[in-house]
Amino acid sequence: LVVAFAIAALFLPGGTASNAAADGPIVIRYASLAPSSSAFGKILKAWGRTFKQETEGRAELRFYAGGSQGDERDFIRKIRAGQIDAAGITTTGMGMIVRPILVLTAPGLITEMDQLEHVRTELRARFEEMFHDVGFELLTWGDGGKNRLFSANPFARPADLKAGRPWAWKDDPVFASYLGVIGANPVRVGANEVYGGLQTRMIDTVPCSGIMAVAMQWYTKLNYMAKQNFNIIIGGSIVKKEIFDRLTPGDQKILLDTAERSARAMDKIVIRDDTKAYKTLIERGMTEVNLTPYQAEWDAVAKKSREELAGRVYSKSLLDQVTKLAAGK
C-alpha cells in the first residue's frame, strides 16, 4: 500500500520546516511515502517547481519524501499538531480524516477505473465538503492501482485464507471486515512493517496492486496473485485548511490547478505501470490465480462485508447511492 500512498502523495502540495515568515513565502510542508528518486518523486518535485514559479515565489512546497515523516497515521497526526501542513495519502489516510470516503473501497463494489471516475465526479463536491468540515482541503485525487490478493501459499476460494496470516493495515476497517467475514485473523501492522513480516512469515498474504508489490519488493516473498481485483486503491493530496486559507485566492487557485495537473500526469503512470507490473510478475514466475470458478463465494463475502460496514464506516444511504452510480444508473 505504500506505493499507493506514494502515488497519492505525488499529487499534492508539499511542506516546509517553518510555516511562513511575515516577509517571506508561505511554505507548505508536505509529507509523502514516495521515494524522492522514484517516478512519483520526480513528478512531485516538478509540481513544486511549477507552483513556486506560478505564484512568483509568494508560496512554495517543501517535500519530506520516502516516509521520513512516518506512516500515513503519522502524517495525519502531525498535520493536526501543526508539525507539517500537507500530505499525499491513500485509502487508509483518507479514511482517518473522512471515514465515509471508504465506501469507494467497499469490497467488490468498484473494480474498474471508469467506474471510480464516474462515482467520484458525481460525489466530488460532497466529499470535498466532508474534508472542509474537519479542517482539510482536498487538493486532488490520485489512485494506486487495482487492489488484488497476493499470497505465498496457494489459494482459490475465500476459505483458503483461514489458515493463512493475511495482513490488514491497522487503520483499515474495510479489509479487516472482509477477512472477518471469511473467518481469517488479520495481522494488523503498518505498511512499513509488511516486508519484514513477509520475511519472517508472520505475514503470508497481502492485498495490494501490482505496482505496489514491485515497488515495495513484496513480490519477492510471494508466489500467487489473483487475476481479479476486489477494489481500487484510492488516494489524494490534502492540506490543512488553516494553511490553505493563508494563501491569496489567486494562489489557492494555482495550488489547486497545479496539483490537479500533477495528479493527472501521475494517473497515466499508475495505470500504465500497474498493468505492466502485473504482466512482469507473471513473466517472473508469479502464479496467476483465476478466481472465476469460485466467484460466487468471493462475491458473497464482498456483499456481506459491504453490508456490515454500512452504519459503522459509511451510511446505508451512501452505499446505496454509490452502488447505483457504480452500476451506471
Predicted regions span which residues?
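Bacterial N-terminal signal peptides
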Residues: 2-14
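N-terminal secretory/targeting leader peptides
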Residues: 4, 19-115, 123, 129-329
